[in-house]
A protein has these predicted regions:
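Short phosphate-engaging motifs
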Residues: 157, 295, 322
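A short, conserved structural fragment
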Residues: 302-311
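C-terminal scaffold of the Radical SAM
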Residues: 1-10, 14-289
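Short, amphipathic alpha-helical interaction segments positioned at domain boundaries
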Residues: 318-332
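Short amphipathic alpha-helical interaction segments
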Residues: 289-303
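Minor-groove-contacting beta-hairpin "wing" of winged helix-turn-helix DNA-binding domains
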Residues: 312-316
Length: 332
């Protein structure tokens, strides 16, 4: 709250059309405190144009009454971290919920009146067969969420899973399995009416995540809390990671910002590439000031999965599999 207050002298520089409560377990926050945050935002900033307010809700952590309460505050989108419907896989990933919690929380959200729900799923997991992944997708489709995020597993350092893989107690799937599960996801969800609008994201008509689209299109954003990152087109800055140190700074009425970076023209150019190629709509070349047409033509010839036309460069669905390599080719 105090950090939000600290921006009151710069409030007129910011315009928002989305709000996102994430970065942990915001669904555990009592509705009255969530309301206080929204009231504080309203008192400092002009949020009259906000159309999407998302809250992350982990399965098993949000009761029906709580969901009804947050819905009444104006929260109109939920994002649920299902990850899997296999309890063995959930345990392997270090998740605290069970498969049945996913269904219960989802149905409670529907009862509470939510008609815009995202579900996060993960593939490329040790022990997750093609058959099991198809089964997960089938169960998910039965729930019929408006939005689905499907990510290939990234094993983070300092986790139990990382140590198991490092010590060869678990083997990560071979690349062929990762690719096949990605393509299966695209095929099944597209046939069910989901638009594959970003590498890892699928949405029903007009249900794309506006908040994340703002990130990928490099719109300015302002974030609050430990580790929060912000961006104003010219620079990025981020807060202290430690909760204890963050609270200590705020209690002393000191700035919790840990560091910042000024973005060069090269940085901005490369970030348009990095983020824009993730989107099925691709990149408007006119946004790339000083782009090298010869290099674009060269990449168009090199990669069959790259499409260049009408001042647009974008990837096919198969092209998403090579996005890192193509991005490197386009960087300056």
């Amino acid at each position: 709250m105090q950090e939000i207050e600290s921006y009151k002298h710069y409030a007129n520089k910011w315009e928002f059309d989305t709000i996102f409560f994430g970065g942990g377990t915001p669904s555990l926050l009592p509705a009255k405190y969530l309301n206080k945050i929204l009231e504080k935002l309203h008192s400092i900033f002009d949020i009259s144009n906000v159309k999407e307010i998302t809250l992350e809700a982990n399965p098993g952590e949000a009761s029906l009454n709580h969901l009804r309460d947050i819905k009444s505050l104006g929260v109109n989108r939920l994002s649920m971290g299902f990850q899997s419907f296999n309890n063995h896989i959930l345990k392997l990933l270090g998740r605290l919920h069970k498969s049945e919690d996913c269904f219960k929380t989802f149905h409670n959200a529907r009862k509470a009146g939510f008609d815009n729900i995202n579900t996060d799923m993960i593939f490329n997991i040790p022990g997750l067969s093609i058959k099991s992944w198809k089964k997960d997708l089938s169960k998910l489709i039965e729930l019929n969420p408006e939005h689905i995020s499907a990510y290939s597993l990234t094993v983070e350092p300092s986790t139990k899973l990382f140590n198991l893989v490092k010590n060869k107690e678990l083997l990560m799937p071979i690349e062929k399995i990762d690719v096949e599960q990605f393509l299966i996801t695209e095929d099944i969800l597209s046939n069910e009416g989901y638009k594959h609008y970003e590498i890892s994201n699928y949405a029903k008509k007009n249900k794309e995540c506006k908040h994340n689209l703002n990130y990928w299109k490099l719109s300015p954003y302002l974030s609050f809390g430990p580790s929060a990152h912000s961006y104003d087109l010219k620079k990025r800055w981020w807060n202290i990671r430690s909760l204890e140190k963050y609270i200590n700074q705020i209690s002393k009425k000191k700035n919790p910002i840990e560091d910042y970076e000024i973005l060069t023209k090269k940085d901005h150019y490369n970030e348009i590439i990095l983020n824009g190629l993730r989107l099925s709509s691709g990149i408007n070349l006119l946004d790339l000031n000083g782009y090298d047409k010869q290099n674009i033509d060269k990449i168009d010839k090199k990669w069959d999965c790259v499409s260049v036309s009408n001042n647009k460069i974008k990837l096919t669905n198969n092209g998403f599999l090579f996005v890192d390599e193509i991005t490197q080719d386009l960087f300056i």
